[in-house]
Structures are given as structure tokens and as C-alpha cells.
Amino acid sequence: MNNLILVKYASEIFLKGLNKNKFERKLKENIRKKLKDIDHEFITDQNRWFIKSEDLDGVIERVKKVFGVKELCLVTQVTGDFNSIKEEGLKKIKESKAKSFKVETNRANKKFPMNSMEVSRAVGGYILSELGDEIEVDIHNPECKLYVEIRGNAYVFTDKDKIKAVGGLPYGMNGSTMVMLSGGIDSPVAAYLMARRGVETHCVYYHSHPYTSERAKDKVKELAKIVGRYTEKITLYVVPFTEIQMDIIEKCREDELTIIMRRFMMRVACELSERKKIQSITTGESIGQVASQTMEGLMVSNDVSDRPVFRPLIAMDKEDIMDIARDIDTYDTSILPYEDCCTIFVPKHPKTKPRVKDMIIAERKLDIEALVNKAIDEMETFIFE
């Protein structure tokens, strides 16, 4: 008998038709990369994936964070004869100390002499005969579910052996995006959600030295590292933004500062994406959350983008965003009290219904191309693996 990890991938991958094999290959590749320094063996048994290793805890901790994996199960492999199956089933139920149980069987090996229902009945009957009054069958609400997978070999486990994974689609299968990463709660969650959909994720942070400290930059670097735990690696571009902000403050009206700064952030992200061959932009904006995130404000920001702009948090409540941030371990870092460029130079009464034509007129006083190119030319690059 061997203890293995059964890897179950997202059911959405089954719906990919002729592309299903590409998604499976990419997912296997990503799993192997995560386990590159852990001795392991990848086993396929009639379209089921299993991982064998002496360090099962280490494997679980890493693979559960691989996008595309929806669940891991710690299973016991037995020979494909009924006696081995029923004995292991009895052992699992005893270990669970449950007072009620149910058996579910998946018989992929059609050469096995019993069908799925017959296996479930026979294993359940054997457990009842051995444990007597200590336990009962409850098919509707059992304390423990016993699972039997019959393939080339047989695999036995319970619902207590299941570990929830992140789900989503294999990272790197759905293009690329540049995330406008701040030090707040929202943008790291947006980065995570895009990566979870298989989008290769890069980040840009706008640093306003000396108005924002090095600790603010370090905070954003830490957030990028945390998001990078779920990806193969992540690149963070730190763009100096002070000169742009000061020029806007000097030449534009106070109530237009926020939206013009947002338009410059979008321009920088687009130009950087063009240089790095990245296909889209992602922001952490949520409709109505702050003054600049009105429908009109978002339209004015989009006006300067030459590529798709994704806002995965657009319809989410703040509490829901915070819950995800806690789940992915970015929350505690995000709430550290260091200001970023979005929280300084904020006007008392920002425009909530800006118009594109007004912004175009206001920006005529600014040398847009020179400001954008200079900021990108002076940026820092950090790669976290």
C-alpha cells in the first residue's frame, strides 16, 4: 500500500474540447515547476493524476496553490482486488471515528468484475458486519464519506482526506496583463484573480519619492512577492511618478488632479506594456468605491488606453475583496500605514463626472509623451521567483 496525492483539476478544463490537452500539459508543467526541489513521481492511472513523494505535506502545501488545481486528496493505493479495497475501507472508517457513513465508488476500470453500485454496497456491508452497532449507513447526511476509485489500481480515501485548492485555469494559458499595483487592499486581489484565470501577470507601481517613503516601496514589493507565490514568477516595475504629479499640480485645476493622474498612470502602463509585449491592463477599481471610480471617471481613464482594461473587482463589495485578501495573505501587508501615490495630493473636491473633452483640453499644457517616456526610462525592475 502507498499513500499518494490525487490531483483533481478544475472541471472547466474538461470543457476545452480540442484544447483540453494543451491545458492539461500546461497544468502538469506548472505543477512540476512548483515541485522542482521536492523529490516526487508523477503517476497517471487512466486519466487520473497522482503524486508520490516522501514529503506529502510539502507537496500539498505547494500544489494547492497551483492555478487549475481544484482539489487534492490524500489517498491510499491498494491492489485492484476487492479484499484489499474493503479492508482499507474498514480501516479508513475506523480512523474517522464516525457514527455514520456512506460509500461512493467510481469504477473507471470496466474489467473489474463488480460495477460501482455493487462495490459500494459490498464495501458498506462489510464495514457494517465488522463494526456492528457502532456505526450506521446514512446516504443523505453521513459523518464520513468513503470514496473508492477503481482504475488500474484501486484508491481509497474519505472526505476528511480532501484539501481545497485554488482552482481557476493553468497560469500562462490566457495571455498577459499589466496590473497597476498600489499598496492598498484591492490591486493585489485583482492581480491574484487575473492570474487565477490563467493570465500571465506583471505589475507596475508608481512611486512618488520623497512624498512616499522607501517603506511604501518595500510594502509593494512584499505584496508582489505574495502574489508571486501563486505564479511561476512575477515582475514588478517601479516607475518614478513625482515629476508627473508635480507638473500636473502646477498646470492643472485642483478638482482635475486625480483623474489626470489616473490618465497618466494608464498611459504609463500602456507604454510599458507595449515595450514588454504585454496584452492588457488590469486595475483594482470597483465601481463607486471612491470619487474617481464613477462610471464617468472610468470612461475617461479608458480613453487613453490602447488595449483592453480589466477590472476584476468592478462589482465586488469591499468586504468581499477584504475576505479574498485575507485568504491569499495580502491583507496584513496591505493595511500597513505607508502612503502611496494615490493617497497624496488628493483634492478636497475631486470631479466625479469628468468629461473626456475637458481632460484633453486640460492636458494640452503638459508634455505627455516626454513625461511618460522619462518615467519609464528611469524605472526600476524587480523579479520575484
Swiss-Prot record:
GO cellular component: a single term: cytosol
Keyword Transferase part of the UniProt annotation: yes
GO molecular function, one term: tRNA binding
Location in or out of the cell: Cytoplasm
InterPro entries membership: Rossmann-like_a/b/a_fold (IPR014729), ThiI_AANH (IPR020536), ThiI_fer (IPR054173), ThiI_N (IPR049961), THUMP_dom (IPR004114), THUMP_ThiI (IPR049962), tRNA_STrfase (IPR003720), tRNA_sulfurtransferase_ThiI (IPR050102)
PROSITE patterns: THUMP
Binding site for ATP: M180, L181, Y205, Y206, R262, G284, Q293
Name of the featured protein: Probable tRNA sulfurtransferase
EC number from the UniProt entry: 2.8.1.4
SUPFAM superfamilies in UniProt: Adenine nucleotide alpha hydrolases-like, THUMP domain-like
CDD domains for this protein: PPase_ThiI, THUMP_ThiI
